[in-house]
Design a protein with these regions (language model features):
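Catalytic/regulatory signature loops of cyclic-dinucleotide turnover enzymes
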Residues: 72
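GIY-YIG nuclease catalytic motif and its immediate N-terminal context
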Residues: 1-57, 62-69, 86-88, 92-98
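A short, polar/charged loop-to-alpha-helix boundary motif
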Residues: 77-83
Length: 98
């Protein structure tokens, strides 16, 4: 049976407490692989953000987009606290999703 794509808000980083990117996707695994492999030009490729360090699943893409917009307004400290709470070692969560 094929896997069901995960609709998520997610954060990528290059290292613990490094540069952060917040995005939204309707297929988290595919998108994280694209970031890791450098297939997406732009901010994540420029800064080498290849590690999926946080994600939050949503039922709809509309809900995920709304959450992404609010998360992007968060201060950096709040974003770091989200990651530290759910992923204190800043592991690459893509490995757990495969």
């Amino acid at each position: 049976m094929p896997r069901r794509p995960l609709i998520c808000v997610y954060m990528m980083s290059n290292r613990k407490h490094g540069t952060l990117y917040i995005g939204v996707t309707s297929d988290l695994i595919n998108r994280a692989v694209q970031h890791r492999d450098g297939e997406i030009a732009g901010f994540t490729a420029t800064y080498g953000l290849k590690r999926l360090v946080w994600y939050e699943q949503h039922e709809t893409i509309v809900g995920a987009i709304q959450r992404e917009k609010s998360r992007k307004k968060y201060k950096r400290e709040w974003k770091l606290n989200l990651i530290e709470r759910d992923n204190p070692n800043w592991d690459d969560l893509l490995e757990q999703l495969h």
